[in-house]
Regions:
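The feature captures the beta-strand-to-loop junction immediately N-terminal to the Walker
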Residues: 40-42
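Helix-to-loop junction immediately C-terminal to a conserved catalytic motif
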Residues: 55
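Conserved ABC ATPase signature
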Residues: 230-234, 238
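A short, proline-enriched helix->beta-strand linker immediately N-terminal to the Walker B motif
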Residues: 249-253
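ABC ATPase "signature
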Residues: 314-315
Length: 337
């Protein structure tokens, strides 16, 4: 418990690797009921990837995810932990150099032949250069060739990985739902049907109940007068409000917002922020990736600053934003003013 608030989500040592790129580096975060957590940081810092890992839209490479006492995901060690990355990177760089060298050599002879087709020896050179290039291409560097399989197998025996099945994934995503930057609405359907469909697919609600709930939340976000409009007839701000209503309609415990205002025209930003402020005042738990520093400072009860796949600083919004400790956060904030 934190200030008598219930711990509902515990994220421990979440990491995400793409080949040699480590997008997330062992991130941990506890989320309590009623929290409004603003995640800030420069582009490419891993914020959106982290958000997608929280409800397993993106499967982490390792780490654990515990929602209301139930572990939905847990991998303590992964293959990447047993790969000799130094040797792999060195050999991969050599491979790239060789690939470029043989490709350039082939291009030189091909260009010479275009300029002077009378030189019959060029055909032979082209054939040999293409063979050399193809030979390199056939033998790409595979990082699994650098895996210490013996140590990895020992680790597997000692570990007890937990990977959710489809039923558990749907269960988790109905409780931790995402509002996407791109809205993810169906343009060929009207507003009301968009909100109804999500309930029928995820919660298996009957049409009458789903319609009643949809109207309730569309009214909450002040879209009751646009229920019969098609999505492509709406402004960006209106689309985002529909996306929020759709998320609320499946009764989630936590709503994840991925830069909810970044795709909007400036005059539409305030209408979406007002809806989010209202949700915060009603105690809805939210995790928001945002560039809106006023929202982070004045609405959130916790700010998390991410950079290069790490949580660099976190804490009370006014303290973090007004008195940044790290040079990286100081530099970031200086560019947002």
């Amino acid at each position: 418990m934190e200030n008598n608030k219930e711990l509902i989500l515990s994220i421990k040592n979440i990491a995400k690797f793409f080949d040699t790129s480590k997008i997330l580096k062992d991130i941990s975060l506890d989320v309590y009921k009623g929290d409004v957590i603003a995640i800030i940081g420069p582009s490419g810092s891993g914020k959106s990837t982290f958000l997608r890992c929280i409800n397993l839209l993106e499967e982490p490479t390792r780490g654990s995810l515990i929602y209301k006492g139930k572990t939905y995901f847990n991998i303590s060690k992964c293959k990447d932990d047993f790969i000799d990355y130094a040797r792999y990177k060195e050999d991969k760089d050599k491979y790239k150099e060789k690939l470029i060298e043989t490709e350039d050599n082939l291009a030189i002879y091909q260009n010479k032949y275009i300029e002077d087709k009378s030189d019959k020896s060029l055909k032979k050179h082209i054939k040999e250069a293409k063979k050399a290039y193809d030979e390199v291409r056939k033998k790409p560097i595979n990082k699994l060739d650098y895996l210490n399989n013996e140590e990895y197998q020992v680790s597997i025996k000692n570990d007890h990985p937990i990977i959710p099945n489809n039923k558990e994934l749907n269960e988790l995503r109905s409780k931790i739902t995402m509002v996407f930057q791109s809205f993810n609405l169906f343009n060929n359907m009207n507003v009301l049907d968009n909100v109804i469909l999500a309930q029928k697919l995820i919660l298996k609600r009957k049409q009458a109940e789903a319609k009643e709930v949809a109207i309730k939340y569309l009214t909450l976000v002040n879209m009751q007068d646009r229920m019969n409009y098609r999505v492509n007839e709406l402004s960006g701000g209106q689309k985002q409000r529909v996306a929020i209503a759709r998320a609320l309609a499946i009764n989630p415990e936590i709503i994840l917002f991925d830069e909810p205002t970044s795709a909007l025209d400036p005059e539409m930003v305030e209408e979406v922020l007002n809806v989010m402020k209202k949700l915060a005042s009603e105690g809805k738990t939210m995790i928001v990736v945002t560039h809106e520093m006023n929202f982070a400072k004045n609405v959130a009860n916790k700010v998390v600053f991410m950079d290069k796949g790490l949580i660099v600083e976190s804490g009370d919004p006014k303290e973090v934003i007004n008195h940044p400790q790290s040079e990286r956060l100081q530099s970031f904030l200086s560019k947002t003013k």
